[in-house]
Amino acid sequence: MVELRDLPELHVIGWTNVNASGEPYPNLWEFVFGELDIDAKFDSITSKVQDSGCYLGLFQNRTSVPRLWEQAAWDHEFLLAVEVKQLDFIPEGLVQKTFPASTYAIFTANGVPHSAFQNTWNHIHNEWLPHSEYKFNPDGVFFIQYTEKSGPNDERFEAHLCVPIVKK
């Protein structure tokens, strides 16, 4: 099932997956929840919209939905962020970004993350987009809205894949 929704401009504060040398972190999630301690950084942002532990994974400058089960998808302009009401306090090591308003097709991925992402991607690319009146909007930003059920390797995993769209 898909939900179509017009979303307003999106203001976020987040962390970009590049180290000091400009290379992506090879152990992304270990670094984020270990050394970086992203939970503490995000919890210090008083203007955030999401609950603690609920994040946005934004994939910038894409022309289609990335293959999320492949590491390369996370290596290129990936931003782990929280939506904020205002861009006031930005913790050290984080950046602020604003993305334009867009219409989105929102799909829910359920199950163990690897297969949930793959199954949802297959549905989007092989069934929904070809048979809908929409196409991917490269002027928007594809993002994952992680929920409180978004633990790694957890069969109860749930996340929303938000695909920017325009009429064909």
Could you say what each language-model-derived stretch is?
Residues 1-168:
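A solvent-exposed interaction/effector surface
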